[in-house]
Design a protein with these regions (language model features):
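Redox-cofactor-proximal catalytic regions of oxidoreductases
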Residues: 60-142, 300, 392-395, 399-402, ...
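A glycine-rich dinucleotide-binding beta-alpha-beta segment and adjacent secondary-structure elements
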Residues: 189-205, 368-400, 408-503, 509
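Mid-to-C-terminal "cap/lid" subdomains and adjacent gly/pro-rich loops that border
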Residues: 29, 225, 229-230, 237-379
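Extreme N-terminal leader/targeting segments of oxidoreductases
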Residues: 1-18, 36-37, 517, 525-529
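Glycine-rich loop(s) and the adjacent beta-strand/alpha-helix scaffold that form part
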Residues: 36, 47-52, 56-59, 197, ...
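Beta1/beta-strand and adjacent pyrophosphate-binding region of the FAD-binding site
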Residues: 10-26, 42, 228
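Conserved redox-cofactor binding core of oxidoreductases
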Residues: 68, 103-206, 458-461
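Short beta-strand "acidic-cap" motif of Rossmann-like dinucleotide-binding folds
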Residues: 39-45
Length: 529
């Protein structure tokens, strides 16, 4: 069923068995699992069926740490949530990959590492999530998807570097709208901006969810079970806003809500100079391509799990992008970086260095421009390396409440994102291993672009907001337990990437959906009890 909060009476109360806050991939996945369950399910979405500018302004935020895309740039309030960023004209697929087994382990040298369960425990949910995400079979063995005659992976020697695989999903979560609207026991409530999880009747239980409508008036949802699925920034923000009873915020008795905030680090870290031009022609496994009917895949290079354990490295995948020789010119790279960052606020910390490269490299820029006009610059001369890397869990990297307020008079999210020297060092060490492997195979060598500066230059985020309501069985170490229930609150659960204790190098949505399906199984048991 479909409803709109703007059409409800002021102060109206809705009674439900399950109230879910946020209709992105996590909320949609759980709601679908509860169709026909017999429970009354309300799925609350701050936005409407489509993106609306007025609603999107509620995503205003502030950055006080390393430059990061602000919430109004990176988050979307509308049905299907931030997954709407993935589907743009000419780019109708999105990258997906499960976390690696090593990501779930307690890793020496990686502080705060370890999940409450291993990868094998999550595999059945991953297999189910593949279907929801429009992916191929749950098989990420590169050999399964490569054509030896046409797109073989690089022939690397046995050792620490391997080719890994990403699939590209085709499922648009917006496509689940009609299914949910038709469900007799599920009500999708649009334009319902949640502002508080109230615990005034019992400090250990959410007794109702307060919703604000466009005009500022209120309505309420009272539910047996509440699931917060509002995204990696809004999840901690809503807990911190719920402070009428819990003065530090709901679930924040140990000052953990908002801490360990991470992004998936992305950076152009170097390029491969091929030993022969044949390497470019033989790199067809690494760009996104169709490997089987309906299955899009992309290869990347990474350290094996064993090499990560031995070297105490963070996880990192290197995508290979075919580029012409202009990519090797510092002035060209700096100009491209500043053009790409023109909408970032604040500006990149390496701004002066980029400007210096441009000024001192005006001759190179001119030569490159003339070559482009004449089309005389040979295409595909190098393979650019783009790292997609894990961050070290860092309690000082966090989401808090700022002094600025949104139109409801509530503090906006303040992001203090803090990549560390360990993050940069791990990427560089991983890239050195790639260089060694390529040289040993006679394929080429790596030219490095990532320096030793701190804060690290070149880093940017991928809109992957992670870790700020982390999972741990010990309430002194995490916000939610192994069932994703908030410690100390009997009926409040959190879904989404904010519960990740560590982050891996994979795009998070497949794992978000797998965890949501796992949580749905738990909710069914609670409803039946």
């Amino acid at each position: 069923m479909l409803s709109d909060a703007r059409e409800l009476a002021s102060d109206q109360q809705i009674d439900a068995d399950v109230c879910m806050v946020g209709a992105g991939p996590a909320g949609i996945s759980i709601a679908r699992e509860l169709i026909g369950n017999g429970a009354s399910v309300w799925l609350l979405e701050s936005g409407g069926r489509d993106v609306e500018r007025r609603v999107q302004r509620l995503n205003v935020g502030k950055s006080v740490g390393y430059p990061i895309h602000l919430p109004h740039q990176s988050r979307i309030r509308a049905f299907a949530g931030t997954s709407r960023h993935w589907f743009r004209p000419g780019d109708e697929t999105w990258a997906a990959r499960p976390l690696d087994p090593v990501d779930f382990e307690v890793r020496p040298g990686i502080r705060y590492s370890g999940w409450p369960f291993d990868r094998a425990h999550l595999n059945p949910y991953y297999a189910h999530a593949q279907v929801l995400c429009g992916l191929g079979p749950f098989d990420y063995d590169p050999g399964r998807w490569s054509d030896p005659a046409r797109t073989p992976p690089f022939a690397l020697p046995p050792g620490p570097v391997e080719t890994t695989l990403f699939q590209h999903g085709t499922a648009d979560f917006d496509g689940y709208f009609e299914e949910l609207v038709r469900a007799p026991n599920v009500t999708l409530l649009l334009h319902a901006s949640v502002v508080e999880l109230a615990t005034r009747e019992d400090p250990g239980r959410v007794h109702r969810v307060e919703v604000r409508r466009d005009d500022g008036s209120r309505c309420f949802v009272r539910a047996r079970l509440v699931v917060l699925a509002a995204g990696g920034i809004e999840n901690p923000r809503l807990l911190l806003l719920s402070r009428r009873v819990h003065r530090r915020g709901l679930g924040n008795d140990r000052d953990l809500v908002g801490r360990f905030f991470a992004e998936r680090l992305s950076a152009r870290t170097g390029y491969i100079v091929p030993a022969t031009p044949d390497l470019i022609d033989g790199a067809g496994f690494y760009p996104t391509h169709v490997a089987a009917p309906g299955v899009h895949v992309q290869g990347a290079l990474r350290l094996t799990d064993a090499a990560q354990r031995e070297g105490e490295f963070l996880n990192c995948a290197f995508f290979l992008l075919i580029r012409d020789l202009s990519f090797t010119v510092e002035a060209v790279r700096s100009l491209a970086t500043l053009v790409k960052a023109r909408r970032r606020r604040p500006l990149p910390p390496e701004l002066l260095g980029h400007l210096r490269n441009i000024v001192t490299g005006l001759g190179d820029l001119g030569a490159t421009a003339r070559a482009r006009v004449r089309r005389s610059d040979p295409a595909g001369s190098v393979l650019a390396l783009r790292a997609q890397a894990e961050q070290m869990p860092n309690p000082d990297s966090r989401v808090t409440l700022g002094t600025r307020r949104d139109r409801f008079g509530l503090p906006v999210a303040k992001l203090d994102w803090r990549p560390t020297a360990a993050d940069r060092a791990s990427i560089r060490a991983s890239q050195e291993a790639v260089d060694t492997a390529l040289r040993a195979a006679g394929l080429g060598r790596v030219e490095f672009m990532l320096g030793d500066e701190q804060p690290p230059a070149l880093f940017e985020g991928n809109f992957h907001h992670l870790g700020a309501t982390r999972m741990h069985p010990d309430p002194a170490m995490g916000v939610v337990d192994a069932d994703c229930r908030v410690h100390g609150v009997s009926n409040l659960y959190i879904a989404g990437s904010s519960v990740f204790p560590t982050y891996g190098c994979s795009n998070p949505t497949l794992t978000v959906v797998a965890l949501a399906l796992r949580l749905a199984d738990h909710l069914k048991k609670q409803l039946a009890a």
